[in-house]
Amino acid sequence: MRRFDYAGLENRKWGNEVVNYLSLIHEYKGKQSTYIKQKPRELERLVEIAKVQSTEASNSIEGIRTTETRLRRLMNERTTPRNRDEREIAGYRDALNIVHENFDYIPLTPNYILQLHKILLSHTDSGFGGSFKNVQNYISATDEAGKRFTLFTPPAPYETPEAMQVICDEYNRAIGEGKVDPLLIIPVFIHDFLCIHPFLDGNGRMSRLLTTLLLYRAGYEVGKYISLEAKIAKNKDAYYAALEDSQVGWHEQQDDPTAFVKYLLSTIIAAYRDFDDRIQIVSPTSLDTVKNAIENKLGKFCLLYTSPSPRDTERSR
C-alpha cells in the first residue's frame, strides 16, 4: 500500500495560481462571517434552496433523477420514494441534513464515514451501506466503439480499511499541527478518497458529502448557501479531467494532485462569488424572487443530464 504524508504538503511548491486562489478564498471567508452576523434570517432561507440544489445535482451527476415535483416532495418529506432513484435521492437528503446540522460533532474517522455511507444508502436494499467494499472495483470508461476499459484500479478490498484509517489519521494530524492550509489538505484528502474508492456504490456522492463536511469544519460554510454540488455538476467534465490527471502515478506515489486542488479551489471561489453577489440583493422580498428563479431552473438539471455517458456513470457512482 502506498504511503500518505499530508504534513509534507507544507514543503510543496504550489505555484502562484494556487496561492492566489487561497488568498481569495480567505478574503471571502472574512466577508462570510460578516454576512452571517448581519443577515442570519435571510441566509437561513438560502440554506433551503442550496439543499435542494445540492441533492438534485449530486445525484444527477450519477444519472440518478426524478421529476421536479417529486424532488420537492421528497425534500420536504411529504412523500415516500417510489423507485431506486428516489430512494437514492432520499438517502442523500438525509446524509446532507446530518452534515448541515451536526458537522461540528462529526470527526473525520473511518467509523463516521461508514455511518454517513450507511445513511446515504439507508433507503435502498443494496445490503452494503455502511461497509467497505468486499470485492475489487474499477474506475472504468467506455470508448466511442462501445468497448469498456479500465482507467484506474483502486486498492484491493483487503487494503481498504487500513488505507482509510491512514488518510483520516494523516488529515487529522496535519490539521492539528496547523502548518498546512486546510484548503490544501481537503482536496488532497478527497483525491485520495476517490483513488481508494472504498465503497461498492456511492463513492462520488460520499466524496461530495465529505468535501462539504470538511469545509464546514474548517470554517468555510459557503456550501450552506450556494450548492457546491451544482457547481461541480455544471463543470463535471473539468472535474473528471482534473481527477484523471491527478491519479496518474498514484500507486507509485508519483502523482501530482495539483490539478484536482486547483479544480476544487476554483469551485469554492465560484460559489463564494455567487454568495457575494446574492447577499448584496438579499432581503425578505427580493430573496423570494431569487428563490423562485432558482426553483424554476431546478427541473432543468434533468434536461442537462438526461444522457450521462457510461464513462461518467462508471467513474463516480
Give the ranges of each region predicted by the language model.
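FIC/Doc superfamily catalytic core
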Residues: 1-307, 311, 317
